[in-house]
Amino acid sequence: EVFWNMDYKEIYNQWLENPYFDEATKEELKAIKDDENEIKERFYMDLEFGTAGLRGIIGAGTNRMNIYTVGAATQGLSNYLNANFKDMKQISVVVGYDCRNNSSLFAKISADIFSANGIKVYLFEEMRPTPEMSFAIRHLGCQSGIILTASHNPKEYNGYKAYWDDGAQVLAPHDKGIIDEVNKIASAADIKFQGNPDLIQIIGEDVDKIYLDMVKTVSIDPEAIARHKDMKIVYTPIHGTGMMLIPRALKMWGFENVYTVPEQMIKDGNFPTVVSPNPENAEALTMALNLAKEIDADLVMASDPDADRVGIACKNDKGEWVLINGNQTCLMYLYYIITQYNKLGKMTGNEFCVKTIVTTELIKKIADKNHIEMLDCYTGFKWIAREIRLREGKKKYIGGGEESYGFLAEDFVRDKDAVSACCLIAEVAAWAKDNGKTLYQLLMDIYVEYGFSKEFTVNVVKPGKSG
């Protein structure tokens, strides 16, 4: 038995000697035998399974992301699902993963463990955006789902996020219930690694197609796009999952001039072309902005590695490229949805939108002026998903977002979605052109109409390598 509550040095030795651990793990650990500090870092605690799942540095050890810590998480989740849905004939889950190092390995091991516990698995054939995984849970009628991703963390990291049957990240009471089950896994011997291939079904293009068809229904004003289909858009997935769907989605919406950054359209968990794959940072958009200047583009968009967040840039009145922050994007996003819904006579009085408490209050002013219910919730997209779930079948969700660059216009996904967001932001730019404006001028007009707020500042991108 490998009990993971002893002194760190003892646990280190257990991992070296115990037959349950594989040779590669032991080799990695032997290599640090003289580095007391590194041994301590890796073994002084268990990598904690929290309300958002796991996140940590990849490597051998109890405080690292590896097949054993991921295995314990999946075994604990399996035990919880089997207890929670014990009357169900066949429990099923979706397993997705991003571009990170070991993501596909951890996903395949998790699929084996779920199936070893009698749970049917829909495993994506290749990396896919997180929002598509959320969609697949709902579409396939699953009870849960996981995605292996660490969002925009540095390359050394990976992570594991658990979702519930509504396609949203787990909330109370299930989050605590799962944590308790994961904490009960005392040793590697408790993890069922021997998969049952009969219970694993590979999914891919079949789900892509249905998801993209659904995303197309998010478009509010296709005519505006048709009038500006030649608008030049530069997009980068920053080596991540957005490359699988976002250029395709933009073309499906009718945008004919989508330029991608070739060096960043290569799947790579080391993110070699950026310091950090975070679309909030100007530095991550450097290559996209260089391409935009070269071709005189109208709009630049970048999604993070798991394609749930999007950063955008456009030109100001002096022709300089500026970054639009998450608050400003959310403001334009919801301004467009609400005013267009009104203008096109789509409002029934039953609509609502949601923002997190830290997101700009100007959205509330827009909602009030247009007589639409606007809800505030805690920070984190699972709380927006909760508001949607509470009103399921009663009210119509038309959009929401948060200042940390996450937006969602549709209710068939229950997590932030950069696929639909990129398409809708491009549509907003086309609509602005209809009115003889740039995206930047539209933003300024919103400030003039609703009042300038503290996030009014727009960052001009400084030329040069570091952004």
State where each predicted segment sits.
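An N-terminal, well-structured beta->alpha segment
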Residues: 7, 12-110, 201-229, 241
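Short Gly/Thr/Asp-enriched flexible loops that form oxyanion-binding sites at enzyme active sites
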Residues: 106-114, 157-164, 308-328, 363-366
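Conserved phosphate/anionic-ligand binding catalytic regions in large, soluble enzymes, centered on
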Residues: 43-63, 150-153, 233, 237-249, ...
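Phosphate-binding and adjacent anionic-ligand microenvironments
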Residues: 293, 297-299, 320, 340-467
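Glycine-rich phosphate-binding loop plus the immediately following alpha-helix
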Residues: 163-192, 327-351, 355-365, 418, ...
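N-terminal small/polar loop signature for handling phosphorylated ligands or for N-terminal nucleophile
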Residues: 94-157, 256-311
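Gly/Ser/Thr-enriched, mixed-charge loops and adjacent short helices
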Residues: 38-43, 47, 158-286, 291-292
